Amino acid sequence: MNVSKEKKAIVAGMVGCLLYVIGDFLFAAIGKNQSADSIGLMVKVAYLDMATWRMVLSIICGVLGTALYYIGFHQMWKLLKRHLSQPKQRKWVKMFQAAYLTGTVCWGYVHAMFMNVALIFKFTFVQYDDMRAAAEIANKVFYCNAAPLLASYILCDVLLSIVMLVLIWERMLPLKSTGQRILASLCNPI
């Protein structure tokens, strides 16, 4: 079976999305015997029991996911650019490009930031045996990074979702039925 480079790139983007989900699960999953308590906004007590390999694997999933996500989005942009040539459509293709480029970079950063907050909390606690102080340090690191987190959410999730919804509902994408448009609308980042 001969699969085109375009299809391979789109599949790579889907695999990247799956790696994000796996990385997020490794980061967020809490066992039955682990505490779900939080200290401050970002620190969970469960990070202390989380194996370091899970944190490292989550970071690797985020890095690989970002690269593959970019490949898929770049291919989608090339397809949109090729098929949408009217001036009104071009505006949305450019907005799609801006959203996926900035959003992909931001989400790679955000994933690493979340993991680093967990690692800072865990290793500060191990070193100094003071949970409150470790949580305070980790939360301060998060607060310093809150603005880029908000920017990444606005650029990647909100802007990309708006652009995709316009492309879907203004019938710029070749979706034949309302059911297909609804399903495509549900596959947005938000």
Segment roles from a protein language model:
Residues 1-190:
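Hydrophobic, aromatic-enriched alpha-helical segments typical of multi-pass transmembrane helices
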